[in-house]
Curated annotation (Swiss-Prot):
PANTHER family: 2-PHOSPHO-L-LACTATE GUANYLYLTRANSFERASE. It catalyses: (2S)-2-phospholactate + GTP + H(+) = (2S)-lactyl-2-diphospho-5'-guanosine + diphosphate. It comes from the Archaea. Pfam families: CofC (PF01983). SUPFAM superfamilies: Nucleotide-diphospho-sugar transferases (SSF53448). Pathway: Cofactor biosynthesis; coenzyme F420 biosynthesis. This is 2-phospho-L-lactate guanylyltransferase. HAMAP family: CofC.
Amino acid sequence: MYFHALIPFKPVNPKTRLSSVLSQEEREEFARIMLEDVILAVRRTGCSATLLCTSKYECRDALVAIRKEGLNEAINWALPQFHCPALIIMSDLPMVTPGSLQRVISTKADMAIVPGLGGGTNVIFVKKPEKFHVEYYGFSFRRHLQIAEELELTVEIIDSMRMSTDVDEPADLVELMIHGHGNAREWLYEHGFSLSVEDGRVKVHRDGKEVV
């Protein structure tokens, strides 16, 4: 099935909760690398993507729309313009694969949702995007299920470790370094990050210093 992906992206000073382990310049570079992994997975399904960016950004592999309003407003501006199914996917899901995306877009339901850890929403696939709207932040997963019910849309909930694990905090680096396969994982190792097992627990180090 052909679809078009919407990927919200903040190019300047992203991922502030990683400030304890990455400088602003590093966070901006790391965010770009994670985004590239997401775009690559989308393109390998044979589909295209538009970035919803908060400031000017150039990307050779996706269209770019600059929207300075909030996340919900930007996505809800875009959805009615779609003439094909829409995939809304966050840019900080570097473990996503074409196979995991195929699982989402193959749903028999009107839409599919991948919940994030902690009650958020990491991926939404909706076959008729002009009928849907998003309400991110907080317990958005339950809210999106409620919106679908109000609109009488059937929903499939997709349980996927690769898509439910977003990289927001230092502790999230553990999962990426263990289970990742793309450029974001390689970037971490190239920048001095490593794993160790101490007292039966996996820890993250950078240049020999424990960070998680």
